[in-house]
Each structure stands twice: as C-alpha cells, then as structure tokens.
Amino acid sequence: MYLDTAIIVKLLVDEHDTDYFQNALAGALLSSSELAFTEVRAALLTKERNKLISASQRDAAWQVFTDRVLTRDIDLHPLNGLVLRKANHILWRCHPTVPLRTLDAIHTAACDLSQDFPLCTTDKRMRDAARVLGIPVFPEDQPS
C-alpha cells in the first residue's frame, strides 16, 4: 500500500482519524516516495509552529518515522527522473479535470511506477487523479 505524506503523519501524531488508519494499515506492506522524508519533516515542523504538537512530540514522531524507514516498515521508493517524467505525464493526463498539485503528482507517479496499490490518501485531488488513471485508492468509501 502506497501512503501519501498526510497518511504517514496521521500514523505519527494524534489526529481525528489516526486510530482508524493505524488499525486499517496494521500488518500491511507500506511504501511511499523518498519525497516523504522531506515532507514529513516539514509537516511536523508546521504542526509545532501551529502549536498542535510540542517540540518533544515533534522529535518523537520524527524518530518513529526514521525508525520505520530504517527497518523498512515503510519502504521509500527513489525519487528520480523516471518518477518526475511520470508525474509530468500524470499532470497532463489529468488536466483540466483534476488540478493536481506538483508534489501530489510525484506521489501518484511513484505509486503507479511501484505498483504498490492501493494509493492510501484522503486528498480529494489525488483520489480523483488516481481514479482517472485507474489506480485503486484506500479508503474506498472516502468521498471524492
């Protein structure tokens, strides 16, 4: 199962749907892009700046993430030219129906190239793009 960064963050810090995703993803083979390494750090720093987590919670969440990557509990696929070219193709394919953002296109491309389906995301644009491309999404019942 390919996780977008927002889902990874839900596994690291308490959000309204953290329990749901922790239970739903327990025991699944998880992957993402190397892009998540930078995006997770940025998301944790944003949560700290917005006073949603403390510095110690930020550090603990980062440690859990890096441990999960090092143990390959979350496998990070390389970010390379092939992924970027695929993301460019996805942007073109989804236009004008789905106004996909650049980093979301990169995640969608990495998911498609790795074939680590389904794409686990709650982002409406990513879910809509995945449907255009025929990529299975999770959770299935999330409104788009």
Sequence positions of predicted segments:
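Alpha-helix/helix-capping structural signal
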Residues: 6-7, 35, 124-125
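Short, polar loop motifs at secondary-structure junctions
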Residues: 14, 123-126
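PIN-domain endoribonuclease scaffold, especially VapC-family toxins
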Residues: 22-31, 35-102, 106-109, 114, ...
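Metal-dependent nucleic-acid phosphoesterase active-site entry motif
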Residues: 1-18
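Conserved glycosyltransferase catalytic-site signature
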Residues: 5, 103-105, 123
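Short, hydrophobic beta-strand segments that form beta-sheet elements in well-ordered domains
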Residues: 118-121
